């Protein structure tokens, strides 16, 4: 339950005006407003940029209110984002920017559009939610996603050339400094459940807790379909059939037909068959629900890859940017093969996304959990290297995580989490999963090393809890990234696992590795880590809300 007594202004006052701040060396040239702004900014990652963003407030003698400082920092970020949008709109004209990889410029434009949209939503959440911890958690999720968008875009621009490139990089750096400052100033979400009394409810369906954006007729469908999609009324859905017996023969046609910015669930029943298409669900296609006939008969397949010139981001067979996306009983695969390197089957950069009883199959970089809050229940996920990666806040429950045999000379590694700052509310949590090897890998496990994860970025965060770990996982458990950075800043944790690969006596001795206790593990449950009690009940999918 949200803490109604939570007050942003009060907490920020405590955060920034402690006795240590009052002892901050007095500077005669600063008026009281400047002193307050300096105290606020010195706690941010980029104090100079922060102070610059507050100059207007100081110059017109706005009362030194921490909430107003935070909103002004966000307004500055939004203003700088507008300038960056203008630069991006002219990119690619007259060869002022030449892509090194197909889709990298469009990636930037799309991701920055998402950032700008969610900056506005963050401001609204903070203005309206000073007493609502859940709205503040939403704002933190939005800003964490924005920082992930920056990293993805700059990675794509690395291989680009042209006179506009340095201007774009500078504009990105300026804009996202203010976003980073805003995120650091927002208080972290306080625990909504007492771990000592909350317990765990197995197979929980909180069907009474529907968010405002789920309409009543969707309540009825989701409740009726909780034990099987076959109980819904086909007249209330769009039907896709590869054999021509539906409303559409491709999934893309159904997505295009679906209304934009829908507050209703848009139900798309995908009949059994093979759908060879790259599907993009853009930000304005909200609340799309894909329902298959079963992951053994309904297939979405594609073969884009980095090896063929695509960006990792653009290589996805199914790409989801629309909030509220759900899928069940479907197989999503990328058939490019291990020799094509990064080749994504599913990419998700949208909030409140959940998948149930799906299969996600590929080799390197199978599942790109890019950003926002995501949930996967009873899914089978296959791959070789970094096959669950990205910077979402994501929980996997009851999933089979299956490592496949890589190319000769390679090792297998399941996760590559890319949290870039300690302020980001992101990470990978696996609970009650089974970590397994395919038959050919298992038979070669004495020759091929296999690991639970490695740190893609400095503050990488991954935990494995209450899960079965088979013996193919190396005793060290975790692998370094090239060069061995981030070993003291990452957070890798294990809690109450079982199976022959779960023994921790030979685990890495890095400062960032933890054998977790109950309370630490509780922080990575669906309720705490992805605010699951606020939205998972609307999906009809089962979930466990504790340890």
Swiss-Prot record:
Disulfide bonds join 379-399. The record marks 364 as: Transition state stabilizer. It is found in: Secreted, Cell wall. Residues 1-23 form the signal peptide. Keywords: Aspartyl esterase, Cell wall, Cell wall biogenesis/degradation, Disulfide bond, Glycoprotein, Hydrolase, Secreted, Signal. Transmembrane segments: none annotated. Pathway: Glycan metabolism; pectin degradation; 2-dehydro-3-deoxy-D-gluconate from pectin: step 1/5. SUPFAM superfamilies: Pectin lyase-like (SSF51126), Plant invertase/pectin methylesterase inhibitor (SSF101148). Residues 31-185 are annotated as: Pectinesterase inhibitor 12. It is an enzyme of class 3 (hydrolase). Its EC number is 3.1.1.11. Expressed in siliques. The keyword Glycoprotein applies. PROSITE patterns: PECTINESTERASE_1, PECTINESTERASE_2. GO terms for cellular component: extracellular region. SMART domains: PMEI. Glycans are attached at residues 131, 247, 260, 303, 432, 443, 523. GO terms for biological process: cell wall modification; pectin catabolic process; response to bacterium. It comes from the Eukaryota. In the N-terminal section; belongs to the PMEI family. NCBIfam families: PME_inhib (TIGR01614). The PMEI region may act as an autoinhibitory domain and prevent untimely PME activity during transport. This is Probable pectinesterase/pectinesterase inhibitor 12. The gene is PME12.
